[in-house]
Amino acid sequence: RKSLYQEFHGSTIPDVGIGYLYVDSSSEMMSNDDPSWKTLGTSVQLPKASQLLITDANLTPRSDNLDSYPGLKQWLGSPDAWRDILNSIVGATLGGQKRRLGRFLFACKAGNYREQVQTQVKLLQQSGETDVTFHPVLGLAGGTGSGSVIDAVAQLRDLYPDSPRLRILV
C-alpha cells in the first residue's frame, strides 16, 4: 500500500484491483495515527473494514468447555495445559510468540475473518472481473502469524473452492 502511494507520488491511486485484510493480535499498528503507515507525509492506514483484531476472544471459557467447540477440540490439547498458558499471559496483547495461541485466537475470530474476506472479494469483483488471487502475507517469526497461516489459507479455500479462478499464493 505504501509502495503504491509512493509510486504515484501521492496522487490518486488508480483502481488496481487490490483489497487488503490486516489480521493481528496487537492493535499497535491499527490506529489511524500509527507512524509506520505514513509515507510522503500522508497516512495510508487501512480502513477499519480492512482490519481484524484477534484479541478479546474469551479463551479461558472456551478451553474449559471444549466439547462445545469441536473444531478447537481436535488440535487444542489439554484444557489444563491451556489454563497454565492463559494464566501466564500479561496484558491485552494475547498472541506474543506462541503459535498455538495464535491458532486459538484466529479460530475464535474465523467467522469475522471469513466475512471480511468475502466483503473484500465482493468489492474486487464489482468491476466485473471474477478471478481473484489471494496473497496471504504474514510474519513467520513464531508469533500469531505463523500459528494461523494454515488456518487462514484453509478458510480461503473453504470459501472459494474454485482454485483455477480463485488462486491462493503463499
Where are these regions (language model features)?
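Segments that form or flank anion-binding pockets
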Residues: 1-137, 147-170
